[in-house]
Amino acid sequence: MGSLSIWHWIVVIGVVLLLFGRGKISDLMGDVAQGIKSFKKGLQDDEKTAEKPEPVKSIDHTAPPAAAPRTDVGSKVV
């Protein structure tokens, strides 16, 4: 009951051929193959760009010189 016999597959293939026709199925398979090729080409292009790492930028961690204490010109200390 759970497995499909050869007759089930023949009926399914026959229905698919009747619905889509031989020409549409071959065109569809050609489009699928072309899509797979372009996908693989895209993966290879990504790998080529990943092989060229960007130069590492270093950050200088030295502290800036300490600022002199500020005094307000308008206020006077008594």
From Swiss-Prot:
One of its GO terms (biological process) is protein transport by the Tat complex. The chain crosses the membrane at residues 1-21. It is a single-pass membrane protein. It is found in: Cell inner membrane. The keyword Kinase does not apply. It comes from the Bacteria. Residues 42-78 are annotated as: Disordered. Keywords: Cell inner membrane, Cell membrane, Membrane, Protein transport, Translocation, Transmembrane, Transmembrane helix, Transport. GO terms for molecular function: protein transmembrane transporter activity. One of its GO terms (cellular component) is TAT protein transport complex. NCBIfam families: PRK00720.1 (NF001940), tatAE (TIGR01411). Belongs to the TatA/E family. HAMAP family: TatA_E (MF_00236). PANTHER family: SEC-INDEPENDENT PROTEIN TRANSLOCASE PROTEIN TATA. This is Sec-independent protein translocase protein TatA. It comes from Rhodopseudomonas palustris (strain BisB18). The gene is tatA.
